[in-house]
Amino acid sequence: VKLHDQIKEKIDDIKSIEITTHESAIRIISKVGELNNPADRDHCLQYMVAIGLLKGNLVAEDYEDDVAKDPRIDTLREKMIINEDKRYSKEYLEADKRSIANRIQIHFNDGTSTDEIEVEYPIGHKRRREEGIPVLEKKFKDNLAITFDEDITNKIFNLCMNQKELEETSVIDFQNLFAKKP
């Protein structure tokens, strides 16, 4: 995602994509070959990286069949080389760190490369909780807006942001906020 702006005009000039990660990621989500459905795609490191490079973000809809039909995704997946960094693997398992480190570098046909981009603790990791909460709140509100109009979206969102008011709301009243009116 961080490299999108830098490489978006050079997608066709990519020679290889070097991804360095930890053993658990390689074992669990590094997949080659055909991805048959959204569940396959959301458990594929290479698919997620390809979407991030192509779009600059990654949302739930990106795992659906209509997005997956883009031939550029598999072209990029085929150019990916996945390597293990032993330090990443060790720190992933260390209780005081639980690092989820990854690094990426893109190499082009003309011999140039991007800088290596390394993230040891991604947004959402407990060490980045303060940074992650606003991202999670935005994601929640954006997803509400997919289904509800602005008024209902704001009503649900604001209620959920006010713990005291939320705790005082009956389950029925809360559920009714989510009921689509005919």
Label each residue range with its predicted role.
Residues 1-182:
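Terminal-appendage/accessory-domain detector
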